[in-house]
């Protein structure tokens, strides 16, 4: 009986001490995808603090840039070069809005939700952007929980 209790206690301690593993999410920048022309796919990513988002220019002439009005407080803006992959490690809970600089007017936007109940949801809903971008962003915001 003592050995079973000791083994159970050791297993519980190891489970508590094991570090969490960050997930890696891949987002493709495409000329054409499931939701139309000039898209991030997937356009909505659910992540946890510490996760990594890899933005991959699957098709040429794309980049990823933060939408400054849709970033958690304290997170610095970012912008990749055209035709280059970009890795973003999300550290703060909240919404991270992204756009492709040359195709923003065509609606090329995406959204990353980190954690639950983002504090910057209202800012994301009211951020000014071109009509097509606003329509797509609203569709992504509908997935926030």
UniProtKB/Swiss-Prot annotation:
Residues 126-145 are annotated as: Disordered. NCBIfam families: pseudoazurin (TIGR02375). It is found in: Periplasm. Gene3D superfamilies: Cupredoxins - blue copper proteins (2.60.40.420). Cu cation binds at residues 62, 100, 103, 108. One of its GO terms (molecular function) is electron transfer activity. This is Pseudoazurin. Homodimer. InterPro entries: Amicyanin/Pseudoazurin (IPR002386), BlueCu_1 (IPR000923), BlueCu_1_BS (IPR028871), Copper_blue_Plastocyanin (IPR001235), Cupredoxin (IPR008972), Pseudoazurin (IPR012745). Transmembrane segments: none annotated. Its main location: periplasm. PROSITE patterns: COPPER_BLUE. SUPFAM superfamilies: Cupredoxins (SSF49503). It holds the Pfam family Copper-bind. The lineage of its organism: Bacteria, Pseudomonadati, Pseudomonadota, Alphaproteobacteria, Rhodobacterales. Binds 1 copper ion per subunit. It comes from the Bacteria. Keywords: Copper, Electron transport, Metal-binding, Periplasm, Signal, Transport. It comes from Paracoccus pantotrophus. GO terms for cellular component: periplasmic space. Residues 1-22 form the signal peptide.
